[in-house]
Amino acid sequence: MKKRVSKEQIPECFWANRPKFLQWLGKTILTIFDWHVCGSISEKYKNKRLVAIVAPHTSNWDGILGVAAVAGLDARITFIGKHTVFRYGLGAFLRYMGGIPVDRSKPGGIIEHAIDQIRDIEGAIIALSPEGTRSKVLEWKTGFLRIASELNA
């Protein structure tokens, strides 16, 4: 039977070395929802910054399944989320998983804030939703391009 997700899909430099229970939980959630993580990242990208475009972002389930995939892969993946989700215990967990809260009511600083948070992370995978929202959009926002350019990702 084909594995749904495996940490062997990414170079070791991107491994987070989180607890085995968390890896198991991520894999179990993906199994329940019949999701797979397809493909792998080549060793030639190790110790580099990569930007992964995650689209379309249309549901709150995207975040749950995304965090499950991050846990199942045991990956050090940085992602941006709406600041209101980062409250109480959930906020601490999301930060532990690589989340960066952003306040979208202050749009001028979102990209700069994200870049400042990510700049010092070597060998980072940055997962971004180019829509910037769950709402249907006709065009993607360009922040992910600015982040990739600034970080040489």
Show which residues each predicted segment covers.
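Extreme N-terminal tail/first-helix region
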Residues: 1-38
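Soluble catalytic domains of membrane acyltransferases
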Residues: 15, 32-153
